[in-house]
């Protein structure tokens, strides 16, 4: 949303917009409706064939589709365009609607490396190369795979590195795997429940490599944040990032959710920290070419035709005082609790 605001758009947000006829009126008067994630399937179905262009932006993992597939329309009007944050999110939709045409539109992140932020003290890592993972502890995120891979490392190799798990425990099984590992390896395996935004940025600036062992992850944000600081990542093939990595140039991909294959990549990285450091320019280039705000703008505008190139006020809808404002030539009463950002 900040990118739309910076471009001079008027943005309306509303949590329950599909339940209000007045808010539907706002949508039909907009220059663009952005339906964010597959959860908006019912709204997309209702707007299919309307005169307003709709950008349906998919960020979703495979895990959610069995619960919502019945709501996804089987055909889309010409006003509906599908985009996804990467090949993984597109493949998830194709698992239930293989005929849909889905274009790439990867989110853009600010250049955190150019910002000032407070320093996060990582002295507990002992000055060793630090391999970190960030995310809620759940089966889909695969912390247990990372734990098994660490245990598979040769003892002498493992002692040369430190490992950090950051995240809240959503599933006990994942948390148990991490707690067991930190108990067995207290000198170089660490767990932190939560870090502030500044602490995350500082972690990305200081760590050696990120590890994403997810079983199902459309586009892990912490991996992208690492790229901003020129840090490579070892990622599962079941992530959106895997489709953009050039093996050994700006990251590494392992297959089959296999801890042994992850351990192989980890062992090489631990033994060759200087080669990881040499990957920094390529990692930064990957961020600039695919994940920067400028890259998002290029993707958003390239190839758009007609109304997609004339967007002036995309709308999201939220709900406070009744007021009147003109939208795209329509004079509309703004419903209670509706936030207008411009």
List the predicted regions and their residue ranges.
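Short hydrophobic beta-strand element within catalytic cores of glycosyltransferases
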Residues: 232-235
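Short alpha-helical donor nucleotide-sugar binding micro-motif in glycosyltransferases
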Residues: 26-27, 194-195, 202-207
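Aromatic "clamp/platform" in nucleotide-sugar-dependent glycosyltransferases that forms part
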Residues: 215
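Conserved acidic donor-binding segment of nucleotide-sugar-dependent glycosyltransferases
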Residues: 247-248, 252-258, 268-273
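A short, active-site helix/loop in glycosyltransferases that binds the activated sugar's phosphate group
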Residues: 43, 66, 78-102, 109
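Short, structured helix-loop element that forms part of the nucleotide-activated donor/catalytic region
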Residues: 2-5, 162-187, 199
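Conserved donor-binding/catalytic core segment of Leloir-type glycosyltransferases
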Residues: 83, 123-141, 147-150, 164
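A short, well-ordered alpha-helix in the C-terminal region of glycosyltransferases
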Residues: 261, 268, 275-290
């Amino acid at each position: 949303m900040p990118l739309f605001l910076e471009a001079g758009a008027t943005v309306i947000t509303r949590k329950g917009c599909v339940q209000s006829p007045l808010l539907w009126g706002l949508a039909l008067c907009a220059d663009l409706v952005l339906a964010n994630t597959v959860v908006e399937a019912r709204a997309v179905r209702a707007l299919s064939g309307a005169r307003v262009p709709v950008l349906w932006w998919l960020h979703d993992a495979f895990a959610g589709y069995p619960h919502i597939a019945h709501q996804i329309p089987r055909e889309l009007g010409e006003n509906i365009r599908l985009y996804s944050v990467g090949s993984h999110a597109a493949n998830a939709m194709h698992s239930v609607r293989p005929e849909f045409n889905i274009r790439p539109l990867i989110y853009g992140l600010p250049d955190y490396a150019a910002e000032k932020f407070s320093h996060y003290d990582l002295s507990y890592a002992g000055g060793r190369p630090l391999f970190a993972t960030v995310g809620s502890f759940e089966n889909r995120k695969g912390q247990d795979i990372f734990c098994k891979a660490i245990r598979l490392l040769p003892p002498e190799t493992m002692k040369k590195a430190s490992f950090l798990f950051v995240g809240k425990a959503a599933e006990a099984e994942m948390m148990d795997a991490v707690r067991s590992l930190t108990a067995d390896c207290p000198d170089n395996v660490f767990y932190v429940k939560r870090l502030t935004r500044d602490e995350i940025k500082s972690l990305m600036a200081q760590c050696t490599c990120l590890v994403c062992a997810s079983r199902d992850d459309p586009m892990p944000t912490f991996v992208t944040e690492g790229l901003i600081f020129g840090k490579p990542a070892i990622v599962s093939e079941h992530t959106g990032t895997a489709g953009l990595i050039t093996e050994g140039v700006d990251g590494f991909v392992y297959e089959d959710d296999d801890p042994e294959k992850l351990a192989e990549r980890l062992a090489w990285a631990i033994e060759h920290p200087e080669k990881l450091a040499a990957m920094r320019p390529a990692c930064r280039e990957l961020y600039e070419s695919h994940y920067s705000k400028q890259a998002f703008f290029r993707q958003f505008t390239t190839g758009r035709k007609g109304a997609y190139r004339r967007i002036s006020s995309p709308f999201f809808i939220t709900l406070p005082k009744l007021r009147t404002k003109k939208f795209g030539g329509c004079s509309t009463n703004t419903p209670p609790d509706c936030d207008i950002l411009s």
